């Protein structure tokens, strides 16, 4: 089998030949990752400055996203009051984002060097994580939207359905469902020599003219279109319900909480869709054989890919601004960390002062020579 699709998204949306200019490729050609894209008119590699810019963006997203998502998971695990059904889903989203952020240094190195230097095992791992993240993120956001729908439109039933234990079970089911794609692409993925360069690719079964487009369309439908449609239906029903009723729960305080959490989930979903729509469309187009025809198009596609990963570091920021409980826990964590540093500095100063005082006292008691 000849490799058709480069597996992770930073590779899926591009294709090129080392010994020619960019062109339209039929789906049965070998597609190479973005760092091997050639200048359409000069047959040269894209500028080093562009590579460095994208790699720098990847590293910034990696560091900021890891700090934010790890803090989100810590807060949910640390505080009992944070273990609500919605926050259990948020934990799952943060976990998926953390895993994919850990792959960005490898992806950045791949782009900068122009080849995959990390071997076959890590190639399979990065491929699997990339696809797991795509499916677990969309499935988790769908579950959060359905959870919000039940809370708003069926408040009595929600008392039995919306529990943290059931949310945990849904999270397990989400990862199991994502394995339907994650495991096969990991098996098909491998580090191969393509045009004298080592590339991390996924081998699509033959006939590739058939399975290539099928693969691309299925990924587009089940990882994006279907979840977004379900989410849209849920929020349409919720908006109609919210407009038709002044009080949802009989309590103004509970009602404010319901609306606040619903707004948070809606914003998280909207940001996700905004960040991932461009790259999803380009993935579908590439799977159908359409390739970028200029260096500018290549640059745009690369930044669209980076935008998808930027989404992974935005969620903790949204929680901090839109959810009072997360904001309070984040503030408590930061204040506690600052207090611990102050205490450590104070203890160190006192220790030094004691040592100096003891040294001075010792020098005073030592008899001077006659």
From Swiss-Prot:
Induction: By phytohemagglutinin (PHA). Glycans are attached at residues 21, 28, 39. Residues 75-87, 147-165, 237-264, 323-370 are cytoplasmic. It is a multi-pass membrane protein. Changing residue 309 to A: Mildly impairs G protein-mediated inhibition of adenylate cyclase. Abolishes antagonist-mediated inhibition of G protein-mediated signaling. The modification Phosphoserine is found at residue 363. Residues 1-48, 110-124, 189-211, 286-300 are extracellular. Phosphorylation at Ser-363 requires GRK3. Its main location: membrane. InterPro entries: GPCR_Rhodpsn, GPCR_Rhodpsn_7TM, Opioid_rcpt, X_opioid_rcpt. Changing residue 346 to A: No effect on ligand-mediated internalization. The chain crosses the membrane at residues 49-74, 88-109, 125-146, 166-188, 212-236, 265-285, 301-322. Changing residue 351 to A: No effect on ligand-mediated internalization. Gene3D superfamilies: Rhodopsin 7-helix transmembrane proteins. It comes from the Eukaryota. This is Nociceptin receptor. The gene is OPRL1.
């Amino acid at each position: 089998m000849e490799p058709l699709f480069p597996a992770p998204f930073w590779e899926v949306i591009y294709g090129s030949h080392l010994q020619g200019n960019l062109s339209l490729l039929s789906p049965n050609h070998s597609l190479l990752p973005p760092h091997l894209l050639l200048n359409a008119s000069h047959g040269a590699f894209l500028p080093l400055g562009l590579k460095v810019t994208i790699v720098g963006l990847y590293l910034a997203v990696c560091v900021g996203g890891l700090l934010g998502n790890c803090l989100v998971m810590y807060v949910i695990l640390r505080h009992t009051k944070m273990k609500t059904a919605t926050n259990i889903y948020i934990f799952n989203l943060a976990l998926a984002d953390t895993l994919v952020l850990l792959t960005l240094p490898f992806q950045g190195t791949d782009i900068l060097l122009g080849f995959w230097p990390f071997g076959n095992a890590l190639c399979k791992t990065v491929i699997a994580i990339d696809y797991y993240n795509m499916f677990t993120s969309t499935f988790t956001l769908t579950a959060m939207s359905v959870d919000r729908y039940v809370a708003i439109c069926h408040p009595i039933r929600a008392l039995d359905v919306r529990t943290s234990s059931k949310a945990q079970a849904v999270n397990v089911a989400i990862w199991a469902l994502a394995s339907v794609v994650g495991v096969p692409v990991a098996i098909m993925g491998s580090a191969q020599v393509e045009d004298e360069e080592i590339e991390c690719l996924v081998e699509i079964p033959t006939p590739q003219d058939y399975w290539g487009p099928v693969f691309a369309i299925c990924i587009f439908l089940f990882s994006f279109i279907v979840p977004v449609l379900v989410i849209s239906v849920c929020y349409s029903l919720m908006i109609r319900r919210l407009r038709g009723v002044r009080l949802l729960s009989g309590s103004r305080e509970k009602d404010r909480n319901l609306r606040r959490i619903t707004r948070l989930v809606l914003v998280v979903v909207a940001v996700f869709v905004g960040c991932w729509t461009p790259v999803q469309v380009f993935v579908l187009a590439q799977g159908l054989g359409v390739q970028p025809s200029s260096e500018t198009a290549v640059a745009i596609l690369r930044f669209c890919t980076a935008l998808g990963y930027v989404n992974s570091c935005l969620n903790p920021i949204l929680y901090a601004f839109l959810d009072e409980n997360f904001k309070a826990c984040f503030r408590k964590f930061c204040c506690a960390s600052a207090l611990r540093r102050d205490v450590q500095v104070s203890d160190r100063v006192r220790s030094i002062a004691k040592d100096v005082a003891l040294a001075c006292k010792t020098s005073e008691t030592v008899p001077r020579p006659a």
